[in-house]
């Protein structure tokens, strides 16, 4: 199977086609969004994906301070997949749980704050790594926050993404029950 490979800021990208090998034999598109109120930052990535990544479909991480890191994954039979845009941010009620919250770009060490979990968010997730870019160089990232479920994150050596990402840490723990302040 041949799939389009590209990465860009915004909602779409144009790239080149390449043959994909098993197990990454499905074409896919990932939209990522960082939404610290009141602005949002979006990137799009088209690549060869495995069926396990395709099954993830979406993830939402509550970073605290009204900020979210969200992803939408769509796989298809065509070379160039399309994905629906993001729905509005989930503004559900606080649920009494909390996690360390941080969005560190360009640094794997970032100062934490408390992220107050909402709705069904009862897990804490932590993702630390580097994204290798030609310009301006490697980009470190450190993401922590509340989430509803913990995806299995692995990068296969067979994909282009394994050559562009270095996952240092992926951890998922139960969120802490917060005590109401007097």
From Swiss-Prot:
Main localization category: secreted
Matches recorded under PANTHER family: COILED, ISOFORM A, LY6/PLAUR DOMAIN-CONTAINING PROTEIN 8
Biotechnological relevance of this protein: Monoclonal antibodies against this protein have been prepared. They permit to discover phospholipase A2 inhibitor gamma in snake sera and facilitate research to develop new antivenom.
Protein's cellular compartments: Secreted
GO cellular component: extracellular region
Domain of life of the native organism: Eukaryota
Alphabetized UniProt keyword annotations: Disulfide bond, Glycoprotein, Hydrolase, Phospholipase A2 inhibitor, Secreted
Keyword Signal: no
Family the entry assigns: Belongs to the CNF-like-inhibitor family.
Entry-linked Pfam families: PLA2_inh (PF02988), UPAR_LY6 (PF00021)
UniProt subunit comment: Heterodimer of subunit A and subunit B.
Name this polypeptide is given: Phospholipase A2 inhibitor gamma subunit A2
């Amino acid at each position: 199977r041949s799939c389009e490979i590209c990465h860009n800021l915004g909602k779409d990208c144009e790239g080149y086609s390449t043959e994909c090998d098993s197990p990454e034999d499905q074409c896919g598109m990932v939209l990522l969004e960082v939404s610290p109120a009141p602005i949002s930052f979006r990137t799009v990535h088209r690549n060869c994906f495995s069926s396990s990544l395709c099954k993830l479909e979406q993830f939402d991480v509550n970073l605290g301070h009204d900020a979210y890191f969200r992803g939408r994954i769509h796989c298809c039979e065509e070379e160039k997949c399309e994905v629906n845009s993001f729905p509005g941010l989930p503004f559900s009620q606080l649920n009494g749980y909390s996690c360390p919250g941080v969005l560190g770009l360009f640094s794997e060490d970032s100062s934490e704050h408390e992220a107050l979990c909402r709705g069904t968010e009862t897990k804490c997730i932590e993702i630390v790594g580097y994204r290798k870019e030609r310009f301006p160089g490697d980009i470190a990232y450190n993401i922590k926050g509340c989430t509803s479920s913990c995806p299995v994150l692995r990068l296969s050596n067979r994909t282009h993404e394994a050559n562009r990402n270095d996952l240092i840490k992926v951890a998922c723990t139960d969120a802490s029950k917060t005590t109401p302040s007097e």
